[in-house]
Structures are given as C-alpha cells and as structure tokens.
C-alpha cells in the first residue's frame, strides 16, 4: 500500500497567484496541488490536498486524518502565528508533520517570526517559494521510509 500524505493549506492560500505576487509568486494553488500530486506519485505516495480559510475546518480535517494518513505537510498561513487549536490537533493525532512556508517568514515582519508549530514539526521549510512543497513532500516520504526501517 502506498504511503499517504495530507497536504493542508491555510487561510488566503487559495489566493496564490494573485495575492502579493512579489512575496508569494504567480503560481496558483491549483498549480501547487497539481505539482505536489505529481511529485508524490513519483515517490509512490498518495497525496490528498485540503485548503480552508477556517481554523475549525482545518482542525476537523486533521482529526479525520488520524489513522488515515502517514504524514502531513502543512502551510498554516497566518495561523502559524496564532493557532494553538491547530497545534493541539496536530499533536493529538500523533502524525508526523512538515511545516512549510512559501516566503522566508524570518525575513519578514517580527510577528511572523514566531510559529506555534516549528518546535513539534519533523522539519520546517521556508523561503523556497512553491518549490518548498516539493521539498516537504520528498522529505515526508523519506521520513516515512526511515521510520518504517526502525
């Protein structure tokens, strides 16, 4: 059975391609998801994508992932800096997760430099543009294989 990754995108990421292209680029979320699915398939991994602008919907989707996915790749968007609820959901389901950001959050406003997720993530990828999703999926796939060997 192929490994399973859930890709979660948080608020405003549905506006990729048109929202602040100088920061986030011109690639759309549909493009990101298509590229992520292609990358996952090349690694013999099944990828499901989910996006929501609502914290509770993200929490619910994480809960639904318990026992159904092997890893989560999450770009929490602005919830990175505010959501204890999403953090607790991730910890509650005990699924390894990779935190990813399109921009380098450490080179932006001071308030963007704190993450409620980084200390619990198996990896954090930021500042690579949308390529960060490819890197996150590849890392998650490798992490799952290494975990299976232990």
Swiss-Prot record:
Active site: 24 (proton acceptor), 101 (proton donor)
Keywords: Lyase, Quinate metabolism
E.C. code: 4.2.1.10
Catalyzed reactions per annotation: 3-dehydroquinate = 3-dehydroshikimate + H2O
Pathway annotation: Aromatic compound metabolism; 3,4-dihydroxybenzoate biosynthesis; 3,4-dihydroxybenzoate from 3-dehydroquinate: step 1/2
Entries under CDD domains matching the protein: DHQase_II
Site (Transition state stabilizer): 19
GO molecular function: 3-dehydroquinate dehydratase activity
Gene Ontology biological process terms in this record: 3,4-dihydroxybenzoate biosynthetic process; quinate catabolic process
The keyword Aminoacyl-tRNA synthetase appears for this protein: no
Xref: Pfam families: DHquinase_II
Chain sites annotated for binding substrate: 75, 81, 88, 102-103, 112
Subunit field text: Homododecamer. Adopts a ring-like structure, composed of an arrangement of two hexameric rings stacked on top of one another.
Biological role: Is involved in the catabolism of quinate. Allows the utilization of quinate as carbon source via the beta-ketoadipate pathway.
UniProt record similarity statement: Belongs to the type-II 3-dehydroquinase family.
NCBIfam families per record: aroQ, PRK05395.1-1, PRK05395.1-2, PRK05395.1-3, PRK05395.1-4
Protein name as it appears in the record: Catabolic 3-dehydroquinase
Organism ancestry: Eukaryota, Fungi, Dikarya, Ascomycota, Pezizomycotina
């Amino acid at each position: 059975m192929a490994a399973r990754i859930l890709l979660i995108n948080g608020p405003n990421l549905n506006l990729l391609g048109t929202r602040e292209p100088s920061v986030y680029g011109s690639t759309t979320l549909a493009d990101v998801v298509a590229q992520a699915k292609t990358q996952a398939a090349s690694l013999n991994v099944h990828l499901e994508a989910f996006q929501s602008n609502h914290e509770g919907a993200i929490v619910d989707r994480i809960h639904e992932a318990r026992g159904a996915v092997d890893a989560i790749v999450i770009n929490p968007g602005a919830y990175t800096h505010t959501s204890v609820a999403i953090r607790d959901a991730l910890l509650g389901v005990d699924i390894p997760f990779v935190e990813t950001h399109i921009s380098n959050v450490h080179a932006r406003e001071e308030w963007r430099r704190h993450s409620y997720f980084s200390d619990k993530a198996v990896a954090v990828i930021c500042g690579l543009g949308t390529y960060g999703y490819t890197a996150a999926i590849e890392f998650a796939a490798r992490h799952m294989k290494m975990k299976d060997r232990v």
